[in-house]
């Protein structure tokens, strides 16, 4: 594999990527890391640059939490168009937007749909509901359905914050609108809902908590490898890792998946990268 590099002003040189990797002290296999869900804009400017400059990472899908977040990610993408892919959405674990804010977000998505790779992070506020049992879910469900519709309008996949009891609600909405591409990030649910999920074409991603969380390990063991992706949800902290060292987190997830499925490490790594690229059409 060859890439072009500018070693002197005005002169283009071809560099062998495998040779470059070896000279930098890591194998080509370790360059096949793709973070399918992170909050890049929430990192410090220094860590953003470190993450985007990490040669072990071939790409990343940065999700947004609101319109301001999406705009910042789009600006970053203009600097790193070959490595950074972005999603636009509204994280559900926060107060709902007012009408004006909501319309502004959807208008922005309509205007920039060709620059984004997904609608996300969107979903339902499971953890907020757990803290406030009186939380009205109806407007959140309505907002999720609208995100589903705009994803369908522009043929974009969904990057979803859907866990536990909310899985059935989401699956019903996705089926209602005949959605084929939905990515359930950091997926976990009960056995009954998991069986429903198995009958769909949807994907799930695994975080570093697979190292110790039996629920995440269960997903890795029982979902086909060709429907799995890896993620960090950075800067969310994971025990034993610094949030900025994303490549180390991703490598640890792949290694654990290979162990749980009793498969060769390189095969798992290649397949998960392929899964992500095909799902997001990169």
Give residue spans per PLM region:
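Short, low-complexity, intrinsically disordered N-terminal modules
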Residues: 6-9
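Mid-domain alpha/beta scaffold segments of enzyme catalytic cores
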Residues: 13-282
């Amino acid at each position: 594999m060859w890439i072009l590099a500018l070693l002197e002003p005005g002169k283009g040189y071809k560099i062998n990527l495998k040779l470059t990797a070896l000279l930098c002290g890591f194998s080509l296999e370790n360059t096949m890391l793709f973070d399918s869900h992170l909050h890049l804009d929430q990192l410090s400017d220094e860590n953003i640059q470190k993450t985007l400059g990490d040669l072990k990472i071939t790409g990343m899908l940065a999700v947004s939490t609101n319109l301001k977040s999406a705009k910042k990610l789009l600006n970053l993408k203009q600097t790193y168009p070959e490595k950074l892919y972005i999603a636009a959405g509204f994280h559900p674990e926060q107060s709902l937007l007012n009408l004006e804010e909501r319309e502004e977000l959807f208008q922005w998505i309509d205007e920039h749909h060709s620059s984004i790779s997904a609608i996300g992070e969107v979903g339902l506020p499971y953890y907020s509901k757990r803290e406030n049992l009186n939380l009205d879910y109806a407007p959140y469900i309505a907002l999720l359905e609208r995100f589903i519709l705009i994803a369908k309008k522009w043929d974009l996949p969904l990057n979803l914050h859907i866990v536990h009891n909310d899985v059935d609600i989401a699956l019903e909405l996705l089926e209602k609108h005949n959605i084929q591409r939905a990515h359930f990030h950091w997926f976990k649910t009960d056995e009954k809902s998991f069986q429903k999920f198995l009958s769909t074409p949807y994907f799930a991603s695994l975080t570093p908590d697979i190292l110790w969380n039996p629920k995440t390990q269960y997903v890795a063991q029982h979902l086909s490898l060709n429907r799995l992706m890896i993620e960090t949800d950075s800067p969310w902290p994971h025990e034993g890792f610094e949030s900025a060292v994303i490549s180390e987190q991703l490598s640890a997830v792949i290694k654990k998946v290979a162990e749980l499925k009793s498969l060769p490490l390189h095969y798992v790594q290649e397949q998960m990268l392929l899964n992500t690229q095909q799902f997001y059409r990169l």
